[in-house]
Curated annotation (Swiss-Prot):
InterPro entries: EamA_dom, Flippase_ArnE, Small_drug/metabolite_transptr. Pfam families: EamA. This is Probable 4-amino-4-deoxy-L-arabinose-phosphoundecaprenol flippase subunit ArnE. The gene is arnE. Pathway: Bacterial outer membrane biogenesis; lipopolysaccharide biosynthesis. Belongs to the ArnE family. It comes from Escherichia fergusonii (strain ATCC 35469 / DSM 13698 / CCUG 18766 / IAM 14443 / JCM 21226 / LMG 7866 / NBRC 102419 / NCTC 12128 / CDC 0568-73).
């Protein structure tokens, strides 16, 4: 159960970061203030919820195991950036993502 909470905390944290990125996207000048307020507001809500869930995780999982699991954020952000904004990702970057996933699997199997 706690691993699901950790994954949810990671996804909420990433969603908050993606909302911040979306807030920086260009929009018509007459819609800019509303656009920024919306996306930054959503980002703050997601990051706040992620922090609450993270505190729940830290109550039961050793920080030396839990913290590296947040490397999942790099994986989620890479996937989202390629899908949402069509950002290019190099082969080297994908190799890094694969290493992160491998590290998470190794650490996760030790608990």
């Amino acid at each position: 159960m706690i691993w699901l909470v950790l994954i949810l905390a990671s996804l909420l944290s990433v969603t908050g970061q993606l909302c911040q990125k979306q807030a920086t996207r260009p929009v018509a000048i007459n819609k800019r203030r509303k656009h920024i307020a919306l996306w930054l507001g959503l980002g703050l809500v997601c990051l706040g919820l992620a922090m609450v869930l993270w505190l729940l995780v830290l109550q039961t999982v050793p920080v030396g195991i839990a913290y590296p699991m947040l490397s999942l954020n790099f994986v989620w952000v890479t996937l989202a950036a390629t899908k949402l904004w069509h950002e290019p990702v190099s082969f080297r970057h994908w190799c890094g993502v694969a290493f992160i996933i491998g590290g998470i699997v190794i650490l996760g199997s030790t608990v």
